[in-house]
Curated annotation (Swiss-Prot):
It comes from Caldicellulosiruptor saccharolyticus (strain ATCC 43494 / DSM 8903 / Tp8T 6331). PROSITE patterns: CHORISMATE_SYNTHASE_2 (PS00788). GO terms for molecular function: chorismate synthase activity; FMN binding. InterPro entries: Chorismate_synth, Chorismate_synth_AroC_sf, Chorismate_synthase_CS. FMN binds at R127, A128, S129, Q248, S249, G293, K308, P309, I310, P311, T312, R334. Keywords: Amino-acid biosynthesis, Aromatic amino acid biosynthesis, FAD, Flavoprotein, FMN, Lyase, NADP. This is Chorismate synthase. Its cofactor is FMNH2. HAMAP family: Chorismate_synth. It catalyses: 5-O-(1-carboxyvinyl)-3-phosphoshikimate = chorismate + phosphate. It is an enzyme of class 4 (lyase). Reduced FMN (FMNH(2)).
């Protein structure tokens, strides 16, 4: 399975095409739109969220709510396009009024202009914008429809913002906590920490600054055998890390105990193996985060990402004007103060795509009934 998406932040719409999705999977459009709505929420979001009310429209590959095996096309309209059409029309538009010649530190502006030979960062920032992630969330939600058939569930939550970290103890089995976190303004399981996080966000907003943080995705009921040890590009942890690192603002990824393993002895890190006639092989710890040697081991997969503060600052940093090469304050585009909660939803979608793709590879079926038969043969002996 693979997908391509296209569209600009102020363009007419976002479009995604997914090829290789199995036939006969029932699709609930409300589930896709629910995840899109979650992406738009979160304390610290910008004013654009008051304009856009994202809804997915399926154009092909699904008939009477069931996938057909043909390429699936999804479209999400940009409501803000009516305000930008005269600057963004693909055929004829005003290219001078919205010109951006002072690149923002930390954004794709300058590298994109240098790579493609632009004297205007507008074409770069329009595509580099995190607006693109709306389509990735829709595609990830579609993948969750497949994962749910096999009992695989994904949960996202925020563990840190601006140096404020949750203190509440939890395990990956605390599903109710993660479900309740969806009602939180920050998708946070710790109410006390959430209040402190909001204060940090408010302070940053008042100062014209931005804040980052850490989000976590937990994947439950993932069967063993997804991914492979035989080649670098088939390792499940490598695929997950690449997908998550591709999300705007992500600067680090860790699985399981993550970077903490570098400060521990091997005897403190590796999960001992036990066997029971009823449940088979099992572990009492999950420091590996559900993956060993690039292969899922049957434990919950736990993955975290570090999100940098958004590079658009209302109190701009110093930069250089591409016209004249003189020092100038960086450009300001409408932006968020904190997008970590939204980032956790995008992260969940990215993980869902990788897991669904790995599951299709493992169960090798063009239709759901074949996948179910293979699943029973492999896992329900």
């Amino acid at each position: 399975m693979r997908f391509l998406d296209a569209g600009e932040t102020h363009g007419r719409c976002l479009v995604g095409i997914i090829e290789g999705f199995p036939a006969n999977v029932k699709i609930n459009i409300d589930n896709i739109n629910r995840l899109l709505e979650l992406r738009q929420r979160g304390y610290g979001r910008g004013k654009r969220m008051e304009i856009e009310k994202d809804k997915a429209t399926i154009l092909s590959g699904v008939r009477n709510s069931y996938t057909t095996g043909a390429p699936i096309t999804i479209m999400i309209e940009n409501r803000d396009y009516v305000n930008w059409q005269k600057y963004m029309d693909p055929i004829l538009c005003d290219t001078m009024t919205k010109k951006v010649t002072v690149p923002r530190p930390g954004h794709a502006d300058l590298p994109g202009c240098l790579k493609y030979g632009f004297d205007d960062a507008r074409p770069v920032l329009e595509r580099a914008s995190a607006r693109e992630t709306a389509m990735r969330v829709a595609i990830g939600a579609l993948c969750e429809e497949l994962l749910n058939v096999f009992g695989i569930k994904l949960y996202n939550h925020v563990v840190e913002i601006g140096g404020v970290r949750i203190k509440k103890e939890y395990s990956t089995d605390d599903v109710n906590l993660f479900e309740e976190a969806e009602n939180s303004d920050l998708f946070c399981i710790d109410k006390e920490a959430e209040n402190d996080m909001k204060q940090v966000i408010d302070s940053a907003k008042e100062a014209g600054d931005s804040v980052g943080g850490v989000a976590e995705v937990i994947c439950k009921n993932v069967p063993f055998g997804l991914g492979s040890h035989v080649h670098w590009d088939r390792k499940l942890d490598g695929l997950l890390a690449q997908a998550v690192m591709s999300i705007q603002s992500v600067k680090g990824v860790e699985i399981g105990m993550g970077f903490e393993v570098s400060r521990r002895f091997g005897s403190e890190v590796h999960d001992e193996i036990f066997y029971d006639d009823q449940k088979g092989f099992y572990r009492k710890t999950n420091n590996a985060g559900g993956i060993e040697g690039g292969i899922s081991n049957g434990m919950d997969i736990v993955i975290r990402a570090a999100f940098k503060p958004i590079p658009t600052l209302y109190k701009p940093l110093r930069s250089v004007d591409l016209q004249g090469l003189k020092e100038k304050e960086a450009a300001v585009e409408r932006s968020d103060t904190c997008a970590v909660p939204a980032g956790s939803v995008v992260m969940r979608a990215a993980v869902a795509y990788v897991l669904a793709n790995s599951l299709i590879d493992r169960l090798s079926g063009d239709s759901l009934d074949i996948m179910i038969d293979n699943y029973k043969r492999l896992y329900q002996k």
